[in-house]
Regions:
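Active-site neighborhood of phospho(di)ester-bond hydrolases with catalytic His/Asp-centered motifs
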Residues: 51-54, 74-82, 103-105, 167-170, ...
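Active-site environment of divalent metal-dependent phosphoester hydrolases
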Residues: 36, 84-86, 109-110, 151-152, ...
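Conserved beta-strand hairpin/beta-sheet module of binuclear metal-dependent hydrolase folds
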Residues: 8-12, 17-67, 154-171, 188
Length: 292
């Protein structure tokens, strides 16, 4: 297990990097989001972290090329949980960049069961982490937190660097108060808005799968997200970017998710208005890089 950061993930002074003359503290590139594969890149000038590895080598490289990123190295791969859409490409990613893997012990055991032998052969160091733990990778401070999902030990993450904070929070059945606390004071919030309740009920999934999605260890509905966004005691509206992610192809669509979120944001008190940008992450193509 790695040592927790002694300052418990408080921001440490660093330097921002430049993009076209503009100073950037942290860049976020959501390369894919959805049930067919999840992949997010976080960068400072000196550190590069990949969150999840749900795409194969060829598609991962193609997505990076489409946003003009040619990575000669990675400093870490972090895995939120062992479901295929978050880890299927992990053996190839580890082989490509020979980077350390950061994962909880129960999730690591699950990965060893569900991934091929090439996964074990390509490991280049495993850093065991725990929910609630804070640690640093380069100049990025990371905080892992527990989320309610039907996996071995699912976690979300917050990242701090150069005064900016990013949160990655998908694959959870509901929004516990502690999760809401972790998401406060976030400048880029990547939040699941998986399904529309009515579309799910009449959709193609078998009833047992619908029950799983709707459970407290399933996925967040548009309605659950709207209730969170409308509540100033939950969502603090600090975010410069609010990204709706992990949108179901079968039981949702981007317009429905966006309208639900926009309506919720109009219900906020005047003194707590959201003035940031509402964005939709896609399964099929990267979102433009978000710079903080």
């Amino acid at each position: 297990m790695i040592d927790s950061h002694p300052a418990l993930c408080h921001y440490f002074a660093g330097f921002a990097f430049s993009s076209g003359g503009i100073s950037i503290g942290l860049r976020v590139s959501i390369l894919a989001s959805g049930s067919s594969g999840n992949l997010t890149l976080l960068e400072t000038e000196s550190t590069r972290i990949l969150v999840d590895a749900g795409l194969g080598k060829r598609e991962t490289l193609a997505r990076l090329a489409s946003i003009q990123r040619d990575l000669d190295r990675l400093d870490a791969v972090l895995i939120t949980h062992e479901h295929a859409d978050h880890c299927n490409g992990l053996p190839q990613v580890l082989g490509l960049w020979k980077t350390p893997l950061y994962v909880t012990e129960p999730t690591m055991a699950a990965l060893q069961r569900c991934l091929p032998e090439t996964f074990r052969k390509r490991l280049n160091g495993v850093e065991t982490i725990e929910p609630g733990q804070c640690f640093s990778i380069g100049d990025i401070d990371v905080h892992a937190f527990a989320i309610p999902h039907d996996a071995a030990d699912p976690i979300g993450f917050t990242f701090r660097a150069n005064g900016a904070k990013v949160a990655v929070c998908t694959d959870l059945g509901y929004m516990p108060q502690l999760v809401k606390v972790h998401l406060r004071e976030t400048h880029c919030l990547i939040l699941e808005s998986n399904h529309d309740l009515d579309m799910l009920k009449v959709g193609p999934y078998p009833w047992v799968v619908k029950q799983r999605v709707l459970s407290r260890t399933g996925h967040l509905s548009n309605h659950a997200v709207s209730e969170y966004l409308a509540d100033p005691d939950g969502f603090d509206a600090v975010a410069r970017y609010l990204v709706l992610a992990h949108i179901s192809r079968e039981n949702n669509n981007p317009d429905v998710a966006r309208i639900s979120a926009e309506e919720a944001l109009t219900r906020r008190p005047v003194e707590s208005t959201f003035s940031g940008e509402l964005l939709i992450a896609s399964q099929d193509s990267p979102l433009r890089p978000l710079e903080l």
